C-alpha cells in the first residue's frame, strides 16, 4: 500500500498525478487526510481521502508520499500522526517520497542526511546535509524526491519504477 498524505493547502498536481500513475501501474494507493477526509488543495480543489492519517495501516505501507504546497507542508509538520507515519516508514526500511517543498520535512527528520535529493528551487538551505542534485526526480536508496509541480510526472514515474522493481 502506498499512502499519499494530504493536508490543507497541498499542491494538487503533486498528489493526483503520482496517484494516477501508480494506480494505472497496478499499485494500491490511498490518500490519507490530516484533520479529516475532505482536504482542500492550494488551488481550491477539494479531495475526499480514503482514510485519515490516524487510520493508516502502517504495517501494510510500502511507501509514504508527501506532496508539496506550503500549506500542505505546514499541515504535515503540525500533525504528529503524519510525522509518525513518515518516521515509521523510514525506521521500518520502507520507501519515503516527497516532492516540491515537502523534502524539507524529510530533512527536518534527518531522512535526507547524506542522501541525494532535490527540492523546490530556493529551499535548498532547508535541506541540511542532503546532497543536492540538478534533476526533476531523484532516488537514493529508499528516499525519493521531486523538484516541483512541473516534475510531478517524472516523480510519479520514479515512484512506479521503484515499486515495480522492488
Positions of the model-derived regions?
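Extended, subdomain-level signal for the structured scaffold at the beginning of enzyme domains
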Residues: 1-96, 105-114, 125-166
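Anionic-ligand binding patches
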Residues: 117
Amino acid at each position: 500500500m502506498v499512502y499519499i498524505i494530504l493536508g490543507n493547502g497541498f499542491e494538487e498536481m503533486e498528489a493526483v498525478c503520482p496517484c494516477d500513475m501508480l494506480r494505472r501501474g497496478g499499485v494500491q494507493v490511498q490518500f490519507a487526510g490530516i484533520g479529516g477526509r475532505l482536504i482542500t488543495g492550494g488551488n481550491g480543489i477539494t479531495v475526499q481521502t480514503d482514510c485519515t492519517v490516524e487510520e493508516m495501516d502502517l504495517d501494510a505501507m510500502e511507501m509514504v508520499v508527501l506532496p508539496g504546497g506550503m500549506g500542505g507542508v505546514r499541515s504535515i509538520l503540525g500533525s504528529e500522526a503524519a510525522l509518525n507515519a513518515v518516521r515509521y516508514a523510514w525506521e521500518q526500511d520502507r520507501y519515503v517520497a516527497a516532492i516540491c517543498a515537502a523534502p524539507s520535512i524529510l530533512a527536518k527528520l534527518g531522512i535526507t542526511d547524506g542522501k541525494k535529493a532535490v527540492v523546490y528551487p530556493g529551499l535548498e538551505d532547508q535541506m541540511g546535509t542532503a546532497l543536492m542534485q540538478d534533476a526533476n526526480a531523484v532516488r537514493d536508496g529508499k528516499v525519493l524526491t521531486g523538484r516541483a509541480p512541473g516534475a510531478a510526472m517524472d516523480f510519479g514515474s520514479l515512484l512506479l519504477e521503484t515499486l515495480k522493481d522492488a
